[in-house]
Amino acid sequence: MLTDLYLKILMEEHKKRTSAKTLEMVKNGTHPAQKEITCDFCGHIGKGPGFYLKHNDRCKLNPNRIQLNCPYCDKKDLSPSTYKRWHGDNCKTRFND
């Protein structure tokens, strides 16, 4: 049976090894967050997983991008979050009529 002290020592050793690996990857430029990614649609270059998650599917040149049209003010090509917040049932022209 492993004691708490032994587990704590193992965890500290593992933490030192992984942080050393991470620092080495950052110095070499091979860390996944430093990897340059090019958008398939517009050619824009960004770094890391954040770029892939935030840009690729939402690129304005992506033909498969979800686009919504407001039935009240006739705005076109709205992102789902913009539509939900400012258009549809919340559209100001709906209330002005």
UniProtKB/Swiss-Prot annotation:
An MF annotation (GO) of this entry: endonuclease activity
KW Hydrolase (keyword) present: yes
GO terms of biological process kind: intron homing
EC numbers, comma separated: 3.1.-.-
Keywords, sorted A to Z: Endonuclease, Hydrolase, Intron homing, Nuclease
Protein function: This endonuclease is specific to the nrdB gene splice junction and is involved in intron homing.
Protein name in the entry: Defective intron-associated endonuclease 3
Species assigned in the record: Enterobacteria phage T4 (Bacteriophage T4)
Organism lineage string: Viruses, Duplodnaviria, Heunggongvirae, Uroviricota, Caudoviricetes
